[in-house]
Design a protein with these regions (language model features):
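Flexible, membrane-facing loop/turn or short amphipathic-helix motifs
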Residues: 68-77, 103-115, 141-155, 171, ...
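Extended lipid/amphipathic-ligand handling interfaces
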Residues: 53-55, 80-91, 116-131, 152-174, ...
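Alpha-helical transmembrane signal-anchor/signal-peptide segments
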Residues: 25-44
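N-terminal beta-strand/beta-hairpin edge segment
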Residues: 43-172, 187
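Hydrophobic membrane-insertion alpha-helices, especially the h-region
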Residues: 6-23
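Extended terminal
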Residues: 2-10, 51-52, 221-228, 238-241, ...
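Short, hydrophobic/aromatic-rich segments at coil-to-beta transitions
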Residues: 63, 94-95, 133-136, 177-183, ...
Length: 323
């Protein structure tokens, strides 16, 4: 009996040692992959640098903690006190992330400086067969401020969340395309510039014709492939309301063979035209929101075709091809 216990103990010890060695090797790979982001050019791919990078979570997780994080993408420079990403060893396709605020955002081209603060900010993404099964990000007590000269609050909300869901019935293995449904919600939003307070907003979207492998997202031919697959952005619903105003919109947009947007967006509103008067003067306000009806509500349809945005048949803006 004693000999069996010794053998069992030896086996357990060997497993622990082997697993510890494997974890150390894998943690080194994780560290190396994150460190490689510091060598990106910040143009074709974002550059991430960490003041301090630590990998923890032994034995069943990999927790990557990046303090004093700095992200460069084009003209935008983003700085955060800390970022954390975690993956369970037995569920490597499920990533959890969180961030410490506030986040400083600088545009090196325009010189603008903004800050986004929060009390909690967390995200998760789960993959299934390299498709996004679900992705979410949620923030609490968000405050967006202009910090170029002092600090001026632009907008704030106690809760904002974004969710993406796979639409399994629209997955086409033959054409290698997938579809995502998106849901964005913000509650009790305050935007002093538009005299908005206690505003609730919801956005529901569906995007079809996406590559069914996220590793192919961002490829140079992604948009042409989406167009060839008859991909479409369905604006299922945009709904915003506060004590005196409502705004609703829906429609669909796609790409034509030249990479130009085509489709329609229908907008109905009450109390919005008066609210955005200082930002959108006539005749543009009427061209976007439409003329008031007998009940005081506004309705209009924006058409997208041949590289133009039209209010009815009147061109109001131009959009270049997307590919």
């Amino acid at each position: 009996m004693k000999k069996r216990i010794i053998i069992l103990g030896g086996v357990v010890l060997a497993v622990v040692v082997l697993w510890s060695a494997a974890w150390l090797v894998l943690s080194g790979v994780v560290r190396q992959q994150i460190a490689l982001q510091a060598e990106a050019d910040g143009l074709t791919s974002p550059q991430l640098t960490c003041g301090t990078l630590t990998i923890g979570g032994f034995p069943f997780r990999f927790d990557a903690d990046c303090s004093s994080a700095r992200i460069v993408s084009g003209d935008a420079v983003i700085e955060l006190p800390g970022l954390r990403a975690s993956v369970l060893v037995y569920a490597p396709t499920h990533l959890l992330a969180s961030a410490l605020g506030p986040m400083q955002v600088t545009d090196t081209f325009t010189g603008s400086r903004n800050q986004l603060a929060w009390s909690a900010l967390a995200a998760s993404i789960r993959l299934a067969d390299w498709r996004i099964a679900r992705a979410s990000i949620s923030g609490e007590n968000l405050v967006w401020s202009d910090t170029l000269l002092g600090s001026s609050t632009i907008a704030q909300t106690p809760l904002a969340e974004l969710h993406l869901f796979d639409i399994p019935e629209q997955h086409d293995p033959t054409r290698q395309t997938a579809a995502l449904a998106g849901y964005l919600r913000s509650s009790e939003l305050a935007y002093p510039g538009l005299t908005l307070s206690d505003t609730n907003a919801e956005l529901q979207l569906e995007l079809t014709g996406l590559p069914d492998d996220v590793r192919n997202w961002g490829a140079p031919d992604m948009l042409p492939a989406l167009q060839a697959a008859n991909g479409q952005l369905n604006v299922v619903s945009i709904h915003g309301t506060d004590a005196t105003s409502t705004l609703d919109a829906s429609g669909a947009l796609a790409l034509d063979a030249q990479g130009q947007l085509e489709g329609q967006i229908t907008i109905t509103s009450t109390g919005v035209a008066e609210r955005i008067g200082p930002l959108l003067e006539e005749p543009w306000r009427t061209l976007v929101l439409g003329a008031p009806g007998p009940d005081g509500s506004f309705a209009n349809q924006l058409n997208f075709r041949d590289g133009a945005i039209l209010s009815g048949l009147v061109p109001i803006a131009a959009i270049g091809p997307l590919f």
